[in-house]
Amino acid sequence: MALARTERQELEQTQGVVFNVQRMSMHDGPGVRTNVFLKGCPLRCGWCANPESQQMQPELMLRAGQCIDCGQFAESCTACMPAWQAARRRSAIQFEAIDDRIHLCPTGALNWVGEWRTAGDVMAQVRRDHPFYGDGGGLTLTGGEPTLQPAFCAALLRLAKAAGIATAMETCGHTQWDIFAALLPLLDVLLFDVKQLDPVRHLEHTGLDNALILENLRHAVATGATVRVRVPLIPGFNATPEDVMTLVEFVQTLPGPVQAIDLLPYHTLGKAKYAALGREYPWQEQPRLSLQQVEELAAIVASRGIAVTVGG
């Protein structure tokens, strides 16, 4: 996909809010991936592993375990934690003075998460991994929900295509269809999260019902796009054999095949991030699934003739 010089320059100047670029990943798409994490998400899943992705704006995080009470920056000291948490609830604009002093934190306990970056800047980082992609690897847009920043997504994907880099995007599915329709031709793989088919339970535990999500999944499959359905296996929410069979039966009603179903076992790696954001972890933990239980759920998917992976 060749780009004219002026078109490339315009794409490279497109801006978005990025909170992480994970290089050399073996997850979130085939082969070796460079995962670009974008801020902003319409859902509020209780088990979210990346709570720092939910708000669109950059946020302050304080990792108390790294704080050494140096006194160089009062807001970073655990002795001042109550005052910091109160300040944390104010808008990011009121942190402008703090932004100038964050470098004083000697351990990195206090830091901003999320920054405005240009597509050209991000792609310069992505291209460093290009030699390792081989036949299957490439760029994955994730988050957060990438489609909340559609112009930035389109710029990154078009620049990647122009560089001969394969593309993928993970989505929660809750966005306007015309945004999906514009991005799908730029994607080699769409990683589509399906968390729960029951609309009431979906609303209760994510903050939104699933009608638009499932409608968009049907539309995406109908276009002939390569779609992988991704399911976070959350004990107490969607991780029983009955839940998985219901999902499989739904997938078989779609207007075309999916490439695979990826089962993603629940973990608590995001729990410390809630504390760093001054928020309580909202999910009431239950015993994790054993390896045998996960394998049994995968076998249910395979028994209906659908390719399945564990871990994504």
PLM ranges: what are they?
Residues 62, 203-209, 278-286:
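Short glycine-enriched, charge-decorated loop/helix-capping segments at active-site entrances
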Residues 61-66, 86, 90-99, 116-127:
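Short cysteine/histidine-rich metal-coordination sites, predominantly Zn2+-binding motifs
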Residues 21, 51, 64, 108, ...:
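Fold-independent oxyanion-binding glycine-rich loops
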Residues 1-74, 83-84, 310:
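Flexible, acidic/Gly-rich N-terminal and inter-domain linker regions that tether
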Residues 1-30, 233-312:
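Auxiliary Fe-S-binding modules of radical SAM enzymes
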Residues 120-276:
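Conserved AdoMet/S-adenosylmethionine-binding subsite of the radical SAM
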Residues 46-53, 71-93, 99-115:
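Iron-sulfur cluster-binding cysteine motifs and their immediate structural context
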